[in-house]
Amino acid sequence: MLKIGSHVSMSGKKMLLAASEEAVSYGATTFMIYTGAPQNTRRKPIEELNIEAGRKHMEEHGIKEIIVHAPYIINIGNTTKPETFQLGVDFLRMEIERTEALGVAKQIVLHPGAHVGAGADAGIAQIIKGLNEVLTPEQTVNIALETMAGKGTECGRSFEEIARIIDGVTYNEKLSVCFDTCHTHDAGYDIANDFDGVLNEFDKIVGIDRLQVLHVNDSKNVRGAAKDRHENIGFGHIGYKALHDIVHHPQLEHIPKILETPYVGEEKKDKKPPYKFEIEMLKNGTFDEGLLEKIKGQ
């Protein structure tokens, strides 16, 4: 069975149940959540996440595994502000606890961090230091380091940088990788024309066994643009065929594939989620040029 889904919202009173219901409405077989708002540290207590009802709903609809995304305010690559680094370390520890409490997620996706001007070497050393403070041999979930586009001072823009972080971490059996198609394309890898070659390179440098999550996004920009602007499937510079082939790649069969493509619509209030339509299109093997209009009309 194809493990495919999207980012969904865990909110209101229903929390995990709401997330599962949204995912099922898209025809998804997995999904990704933030355990609270991605831009702040406010979090509901674990007992208010409605875990039991959410897990029951997932079970009834054949969803066995989900992904958690760490909030993007975490920056353990920061060497200039000790308080930012410490906030990241403390918050990541909390996210591990919350994810373990959910009991249905094995991976927490993390943007490795940004060096904010200190240089990539200093940033990578700081990320290693942070992960060494966070990871324990007892934890039951992994931190999945996301491949980054190289925007600004991001670390993790190349497979070599990801490998350096992993190699420096003591309990690195608790580390995996989230491969983002838009980011990797924007970082300069030719996944549109030679995904097998890119995957081979990843295997040599990082090891394919580390690849445990796939973020499936098209890109608004040309290869190597270092921009990180996601586009709807088939409407960007990677293209439908390449993304379809990646989603159905035999070496990645067991890995959850998560769409983070933009909502569609002119005005903010009119924007509609594309996921039901994109999931169906990736399953059926045919690109639909009229997809965006269908999404708007739902």
From Swiss-Prot:
This is Probable endonuclease 4. Zn(2+) 3 binds at residues 183, 228, 230. Its cofactor is Zn(2+). Its EC number is 3.1.21.2. HAMAP family: Nfo. Belongs to the AP endonuclease 2 family. One of its GO terms (biological process) is base-excision repair. SMART domains: AP2Ec. Keywords: DNA damage, DNA repair, Endonuclease, Hydrolase, Metal-binding, Nuclease, Zinc. Gene3D superfamilies: Divalent-metal-dependent TIM barrel enzymes.
